[in-house]
Amino acid sequence: DPRGCLYGCNGSCNARCADYVEYILAKEGDVAAVVVETVRCTDVQIPPRAYYETLRRACDRHGALLVLDEIPICLGRTGRMFAFEHYGIVPDMVVLGKGLGGGVFPLAALLARADLDVAAEGALGHYTHEKSSVGCAAGLATLEVIEDERLLQRSTDLGARALGQLKAMQARQEAVADVRGIGLLLGVELQDAAVAEDVLYRCLAKG
């Protein structure tokens, strides 16, 4: 959150935190990967382009992988199939989930550069219902619907409209501290925790 930034960005992100990541990579010398949630889902923190450009250069310079967690925001929520497409960079790995199964079946995926797409003879851990053929069918159907119904453009258009309406509401409501959005990933930040809790339960009551 730029307003609470420890690096003195004074309310507008200057990507100094990304410079600090490079400092750590240089000092440590043996960091395997930098793992980042591309756009923070829970409170919709949207980094500037310079942030990811700096991270990408830093990882390349110091031999670390850039791994992006897009589990909660993948496949169109931001108006692009992958949120990292907004930043003009390509990660070494990207993790997908949630929406990948169309909201009806648990499914996750790890996409990787071709030279990293290797598997050992034995592996542990996995799950998310262990490579189910039903889940894979749901995932393929989801991708087809996104493409056939042009849902990426729909997300962009509806998101812009919704963000405009929310910003108009912000101008009328003193309780609203900030409004942020990218595609249909939208966030409204309220000034007061008690007001936020009241709004939460009113929303739940209305379904």
Segment roles from a protein language model:
Residues 1-207:
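Conserved N-terminal phosphate-binding loop of PLP-dependent enzymes in the Aspartate aminotransferase
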